[in-house]
Regions:
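FNR/FR-type flavoprotein reductase catalytic core
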Residues: 3, 81-239, 245
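Ferredoxin-reductase
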Residues: 2-92, 96, 106-109, 143-145
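Short polybasic amphipathic segments
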Residues: 42, 233-238, 275-277
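A short, compositionally biased
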Residues: 37-39, 227-233, 271
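Local cysteine-cluster metal-coordination motifs and their immediate loop/turn environment
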Residues: 122, 261-283, 294
């Protein structure tokens, strides 16, 4: 899948292992790259035709490069697997300019950052920014094994209140998110990024906290949660007058692309926001994840 007209052609400058099954990829261009803020992501258009969104982990002040952290997903459909097995330094890759759906509220009196697995990438970015601003913040990072905890050494350096939870060193016990949330002051802002079970635990724990103080970023599709929870529906296009039946087990994007409708998209999983469009009529339902899997 090629990028949009605003896509950048960047060179793969460096590929480096930073943890078990986690690579950091550095892209560089011929000139300064478009600016971004902590929590931003870029859509990477891979040579195999797949596009995926990855959080930027380098300092926004350094506009000479973009760096992303990519975990190897055993269920990969070609994104992380291609990067881990096929990407090489020197390749030219199309990348869309940064977008930010996980904005940091820099005015917060206190901030708590929680991450699981590769969800540490945008959290690491926020932690660096808060340290630069000399704000009060805590970081909780969870991983199954110490060898899989990406950026842990850097987080120890920038945050005096950094907590690393390793399941295998705690008799298999997961990070106690409800306890962390209960300990916070009323005006604390809370951020979380991680796999479905962690996100489910977090959203349950913050249910009574004002929405303006709760910030989440999903790295996985919600398709499993959606299946069986909503029925078929008709989708109408205002300009063309065309109408399509969207089955319960398909996404609107899939049906539109299948019928030759041009739609800006990237991850094709409802995560990155590239296909977001305006709804003129109808009611949308927010489907919450309920997936009792290991959280990282």
């Amino acid at each position: 899948m090629s990028g949009s007209s605003s896509s950048l052609k960047l060179r793969v400058q460096r590929i480096e292992w930073i943890a078990e099954d986690v690579l950091e990829i550095e892209f560089r261009g011929e000139t300064d790259l478009p600016a971004f803020t902590s929590g931003s992501h870029i859509d990477v258009h891979l040579p195999n035709g797949i596009s995926r969104s990855y959080s930027l982990v380098n300092d926004p002040a350094d506009r000479s490069r973009y760096c992303i952290g990519v975990g190897m997903d055993p269920k990969s459909r070609g994104g992380s697997r291609h990067i881990h097995t096929q990407l090489r330094p020197g390749q030219i890759i199309e990348v869309d300019p940064p977008l930010n759906n996980f904005v940091l509220d820099e005015s917060a009196e206190r901030t708590v950052l929680i991450a699981g697995g590769i969800g540490i990438t945008p959290i690491f970015s926020h932690a660096r920014r808060l340290a630069q601003l000399q704000k009060e913040f805590e970081v909780y990072q969870a991983a199954r094994e110490r060898s899989r905890a990406a950026y842990c050494e850097k987080l120890e350096e920038i945050s005096p209140m950094y907590h690393l939870h390793i399941d295998d060193e705690n008799e298999g016990q997961f990070l106690d998110i409800p306890r962390i949330v209960q300990q916070q002051t009323p005006k604390t802002h809370l951020y979380c990024c991680g796999p479905p079970a962690m996100m489910q635990s977090f959203e349950a724990a913050v249910a009574k906290i004002p929405e303006s103080q709760v910030h989440v970023e999903y790295f996985v599709a919600r398709s499993e949660a959606e299946q069986g929870q909503s029925g078929d529906f008709f989708l109408g296009l205002a300009r063309s007058g065309r109408e399509f039946l969207v089955p319960a087990d398909r996404s609107a994007l899939e049906v539109l692309l299948e019928n030759g409708v041009t739609v800006s998209n990237s991850c094709q999983e409802g995560i990155c926001g590239s296909c977001e469009t305006r709804v003129l009529e109808g009611t949308l339902s927010l489907i919450h994840i309920s997936e009792p899997t290991r959280p990282y």
